[in-house]
Amino acid sequence: MKANLCYRAGAVLAVMLLTAVFAAAADNGDGIFVLTSTNSASNNDVVVFKLNTAGTPTLSLVNMLPTGGAGGASGNAGAVQFGDDFGAVANFGSNSVSQLVRQGGSISVAGTIKLAPGCVKPASVALAGNQLFVVGANCAESHKFPSGNVDGPVVALTDPSAAQIAVGQSWAAVTMTSGSVLQLLLNGEGTLNGTTAKVTLPSAANNTPLGAAFWGDILGFNPAHSPDSFALVNKNRNVFPVVGPQPPYPTNAPCWLAKGPGSLWYSGNSPGQAISIFFSDGQGGTFYKSVSLPGTPTDITVSRDRQWLAVIYTAADGSGGRVAVFAIDAYGDLSPVATSSPIGVAAFSGVAFSQ
């Protein structure tokens, strides 16, 4: 009987927490949007979904916006980002970034930002303050945003395998699928200052670095094909590896990373078809559990208010690219909220919230 009462109390608490999340979201009259891209090698489109939390939650297609550029990237994350009113999407095949703008309850493509001369194939973008950061096949660069002008030195890259760029307080990081992480220092105004250093990775955490995210000035990243498939790096380039879900690659490979509330991190585990959850402090952490998905995740994000998680995945039933949204409760646990219907796109690239 006591166990029954505990179960009922827990269920009531879970419902109350989920209801509170929905109520907080409903306070935003303009709504919550989830953006991704088709990544088409001929004509890239931004795909805009709206999350409706009234009654039975839904994730409905609102618009498909031609970027005016071409996609075609693979093995990357962070192709789409969104801040307060402006966002960006990488056009890998046309050496450009499209600027997005939100006005009330609508999102549109506002223009094209060209890469610095000689820089090609942008794979990942990041937004921090009034800066846009871009990494491609041969350059990492920062631009004033939303104006788009190159701001600060362009960093030449000799390794064309960049997967993602992420930005902290005093430094940015680029993960390289070839097996390295590059530190890019920032100046006092938050732009790249041209100084770079390679992070020395331990042998148990150096195979195929992919997803990356910052917690203040601490980098978290996924060396996806390593036994230690999650790791932290501080500004002094000290590395703190964390054992991932077992068995390791090829059964499990946390690939794509998002920072959650508190000490939580969420990772898209592609072969495991799951979201793998980690806890950490600043010098280590632990794998907690995995939440199953009906397909292979290809990128993941958490909303700025830390109440929602969105993951893009390629459905196991062959229906193509899908977006799933989860509510994050007060303890960091995930509750499924809504999933998009198939729209005829084989796989999505990049995912971001606009609130």
What are these regions (language model features)?
Residues 321-355:
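Blade-level signature of beta-propeller repeat domains, shared across WD40, Kelch, NHL, RCC1
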Residues 49-57, 100-106, 144-150, 183-192, ...:
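Short loop/turn segments immediately following beta-strands, especially the blade-tip
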Residues 10-20:
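Bacterial N-terminal signal peptides
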Residues 60-71, 108-116, 151-157, 193-203, ...:
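A short beta-strand motif characteristic of beta-propeller blades
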Residues 133-189, 195-204:
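Aromatic- and glycine-enriched pocket-lining scaffold segments that form the walls
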Residues 27, 68-83, 115-131, 156-171, ...:
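Beta-rich, blade/repeat-based domains predominating
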Residues 29-40, 89-93, 134-138, 168-169, ...:
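Conserved beta-strand positions in repeat-built beta-propeller and related beta-rich domains
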Residues 43-47, 96-98, 141, 180-183, ...:
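Structural motif
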